[in-house]
């Protein structure tokens, strides 16, 4: 099958965030956040609920124009990218996408091809081939004509990813991409994204709550707490008993896995009765 048309990613730094600050509804969400992501790298942002992870991804995707500091994608400040150019550069899978009522799966996935459709034009045969390719890769071909509203949560999650992959952008932002998936489809989705990294140099910036899964796929992890970066490095340096205990207020034991550290919750000991 024909793979989705992909914009060629320059080498070097894909994402450069400098001194980013975000205030929403009068509340300071992010303060002085700086990070960089190399082209072809997989960086996963972790942190407790309310830390600002999703807000960071929205800012990187250009969805928070009122933020302070700067965000550049492949060397270009995001504020200078026209909407169509931005859509060809970065694809986003948000936690709760807005889905038009009654829209079928194939039509939704084809929305990812919008940046390549000329004004007043229609999707080409190549666009349809790209959409069917990702549907096939995500085991969704049989759902192409189904309304999205009739699918389970996990099936919809895969459709949301399919739309983003059909976009063919060199940068993929994933906000909790496996939250509604069973373990089999989690592995299927993440292995597909990782294969696209290997084959096409795709750059991935994700947020994830499952720390063990995050540690197996990420090249680097960024721990955010109270709106600030408190740790940045390889999974083995960030997923430690001390850091997780401090910022998650959780009892855990970190053990070595085949592809990265695994985080195991530890129950509190109760005094003998």
Q: Model-flagged regions — what are they?
A:
Residues 172-176:
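Catalytic Walker B motif of ABC-type/P-loop ATPase nucleotide-binding domains
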Residues 245-273:
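ABC ATPase nucleotide-binding domains
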């Amino acid at each position: 099958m024909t793979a989705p048309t992909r914009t060629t990613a320059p080498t070097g730094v894909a994402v450069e965030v400098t001194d980013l600050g975000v205030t929403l509804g009068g509340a300071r969400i992010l303060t002085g956040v700086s990070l960089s992501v190399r082209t072809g790298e997989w960086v996963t942002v972790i942190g407790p609920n309310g830390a600002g992870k999703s807000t960071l991804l929205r800012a990187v995707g250009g969805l928070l124009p009122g933020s302070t500091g700067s965000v550049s994608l492949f060397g270009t400040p995001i504020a200078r990218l026209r909407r169509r150019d931005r859509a060809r550069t970065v694809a986003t899978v948000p936690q709760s996408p807005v889905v038009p009522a009654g829209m079928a799966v194939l039509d939704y996935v084809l929305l990812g091809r919008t940046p390549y459709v000329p004004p007043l034009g229609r999707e080409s045969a190549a666009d349809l081939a790209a959409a069917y390719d990702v549907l096939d890769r995500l085991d969704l071909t049989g759902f192409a004509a189904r309304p999205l509203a009739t699918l389970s949560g996990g099936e919809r999650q895969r459709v949301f990813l399919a739309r983003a992959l059909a976009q063919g952008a060199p940068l993929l932002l994933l906000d909790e991409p496996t939250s509604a998936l069973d373990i089999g489809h989690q592995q299927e989705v993440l292995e597909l994204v990782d294969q696209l990294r290997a084959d096409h140099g795709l750059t991935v910036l994700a947020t994830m709550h499952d720390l063990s899964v995050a540690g197996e796929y990420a090249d680097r992890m960024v721990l955010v707490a109270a709106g600030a970066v408190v740790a940045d490095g390889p999974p083995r340096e960030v997923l430690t008993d001390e850091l997780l205990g401090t910022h998650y207020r959780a009892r855990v034991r970190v053990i070595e896995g085949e592809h990265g550290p695994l985080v195991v919750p530890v129950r509190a000991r109760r005094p003998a009765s």
